[in-house]
Amino acid sequence: MEKYCELIRKRYAEIASGDLGYVPDALGCVLKVLNEVAADDALSESVREKAAYAAANLLVSDYVNE
């Protein structure tokens, strides 16, 4: 967990403690957020490209959308 930022570690602790809801379809959750980031014209092109690249890699390597 040390390699992740403070906000991620905080949310992790909240989910683990039951204070924040757990999402069983974690890959779907990640892809939804990455898609939202990649499509958001208010964000920098660099951030959008990073999100698109991460989502595409996830789709190629791990995820099957049925």
Curated annotation (Swiss-Prot):
Family matches, as InterPro entries: UPF0253
Its name, as the record gives it, is UPF0253 protein CKO_03176
Which top-rank group of organisms is this from?
Bacteria
In its UniProt entry, the species of origin is given as: Citrobacter koseri (strain ATCC BAA-895 / CDC 4225-83 / SGSC4696)
Family listed: Belongs to the UPF0253 family.
Q: Name one Pfam family in it.
A: UPF0253
